[in-house]
Amino acid sequence: MTTFSEKEKIQLLADIVELQTENNNEIDVCNYLKDLFDKYDIKSEILKVNEHRANIVAEIGNGSPILALSGHMDVVDAGNQDNWTYPPFQLTEKAGKLYGRGTTDMKGGLMALVITLIELKEQNQLPQGTIRLLATAGEEKEQEGAKLLADKGYLDDVDGLIIAEPTGSGIYYAHKGSMSCKVTATGKAVHSSVPFIGDNAIDTLLEFYNQFKEKYSELKKHDTKHELDVAPMFKSLIGKEISEEDANYASGLTAVCSIINGGKQFNSVPDEASLEFNVRPVPEYDNDFIESFFQNIINDVDSNKLSLDIPSNHRPVTSDKNSKLITTIKDVASSYVEQDEIFVSALVGATDASSFLGDNKDNVDLAIFGPGNPLMAHQIDEYCLTVNIQISTSTFSLIK
């Protein structure tokens, strides 16, 4: 017998979808969850990142082993709300779909974890050991919340970690890292009619970029053996086999120049220009390697005119894809999903696990598994299937 009806579960999700946490204000969700946990006599604690951003930690059970369940409370910007069919911050149920910002990424997964915690406690189905819920702030950008919890030791004693990001029929045991690398070139501004007495920062930046492309292309020729295999993920998401060449490329290091800035007006030689890259490190080419890779090119071009800044730096995470945690989730999920639809894979994206696990990653079984299609994340008219919330809640309740 469940504590909440299906209608009540949807209302709980609706309540936190209405709390607008676009890259901020997670404290509102923390306060809501604190009241909910208090109602069911579950011990919880709010840990502030700053005035408007906070995490909440809740626990049931005691002793070992310790299983951590995690989800983030922030969502990405909804963009122009006029482009949405339904209001992004009002849950709309239509034809078996739950529309709203965060339904997939990832308030749906978070609320499934919260409901699981409450129902296990209320039904006296407490596990042997401890279940610790970690709801985090700031995952979408700098993972401030996860870093705070890791620094305070909330992951030091855990044996397993489930992050309820949207995964469809997938269960993920590992993922790439993510780095933001900004290269800035400086020059000397002068009137564009006399460029020879100035120093065009764009020229220096282009020299860097041309060398980067050449050396990155050469690196990728040798990037052929990978610890992380993302092919099962792509096969499921695109619905067909991918070539060995594409699977090999996707499983390796990737780097994309995604932002370029330079110059302020057409008749002035620019004294500053910048490129920003998103790099996805892998175990073979980790974050330290990437930093050196960029810095070496800067040194080759002109280190007096070029500088490197790394505002975001999340490491790849690996664990045993045949762990007891992964096997248990797969076995339980097969009661609700066709066995041949379930797959185990590495993930191309990054999660709070990068900040959570750190040096402790070799001692923790990791599973990324939650309701929603990952392709719906960050989209206009984001939705999660109602049945996916139900399946995830049922699955989580049996992993204990």
Swiss-Prot record:
GO terms for biological process: diaminopimelate biosynthetic process; lysine biosynthetic process via diaminopimelate. One of its GO terms (molecular function) is metal ion binding. It comes from the Bacteria. Its EC number is 3.5.1.18. Coiled coil: none annotated. Transmembrane segments: none annotated. Binds 2 Zn(2+) or Co(2+) ions per subunit. It catalyses: N-succinyl-(2S,6S)-2,6-diaminopimelate + H2O = (2S,6S)-2,6-diaminopimelate + succinate. It is an enzyme of class 3 (hydrolase). Keywords: Amino-acid biosynthesis, Cobalt, Diaminopimelate biosynthesis, Hydrolase, Lysine biosynthesis, Metal-binding, Zinc. Zn(2+) 2 binds at residues 105, 140, 378. Zn(2+) 1 binds at residues 72, 105, 165. Its cofactor is Zn(2+); Co(2+). PROSITE patterns: ARGE_DAPE_CPG2_1 (PS00758), ARGE_DAPE_CPG2_2 (PS00759). The active site is at residues 74, 139. Pfam families: M20_dimer (PF07687), Peptidase_M20 (PF01546). Pathway: Amino-acid biosynthesis; L-lysine biosynthesis via DAP pathway; LL-2,6-diaminopimelate from (S)-tetrahydrodipicolinate (succinylase route): step 3/3. Belongs to the peptidase M20A family. This is Probable succinyl-diaminopimelate desuccinylase. It comes from Staphylococcus aureus (strain Mu50 / ATCC 700699). The gene is dapE.
